[in-house]
Amino acid sequence: GSCADPDIVPFNAGDPGCGKTEIWRTLQKKFSFIKIINGPQLSCDGWKGSYHVKDIFLEEKPQMREHMIVVVDEADKLFEPMVGSGGTDFSRSIQNEFLKLIDGDQVTFVNEDNRKDPQTAKIDCRNISFVFCGSFEMLRNNKEDRSSAIGFSSSTETADLTSEVTEEDLVLYGHIRREIAGRID
């Protein structure tokens, strides 16, 4: 059986310190299949950086790799555009790597820690779920500031932050690729 429904990608947005990560830490103590990662630490395969997307899986026991809930903490910072001096948008590249995983594809990772004998790991991602947590401040501020004017006098209505965040909100203000945003509930 599966530990979660991989077709649902939950999204948790809230102020820093409101308990988004703490909820998952508490659940992680009870359920070993929950893995929390720090989004801004991630870098793409082949780039400099201490933690790559493939490391999420390679550091796990083989029997755990294909049945996990991966909680990406501070995902909003991971999704913000990060353009290098050569014009490469690193955020988009990382999102491309996540898209393969979220799609439930079979992915092969190469562990090159031992350069003389690199190990490969083929992972079936169908039973892996992802959760994106972060403050998503720009997205929340935009939803909060939406107003409507009626007649000659304007009345401002503050959007209920518990209201549904649309796919368009995620794309425009969360900087999330449409292919990923369409899978977020």
Where are these regions (language model features)?
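Surface-exposed acidic, glycine-flexible loop patches that form ligand/cofactor-binding
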Residues: S2-C3, P62-Q63, T120-K122
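Short, well-ordered amphipathic alpha-helices
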Residues: G1, K54-E60, F98-V107
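Canonical AAA+ ATPase core
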Residues: A13, E22-T26, F31, D76-D185
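Walker A/P-loop
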Residues: S2-I37
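Residue-level preference for the first positions of well-ordered beta-strands
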Residues: D7-F11, H67-I69, S129
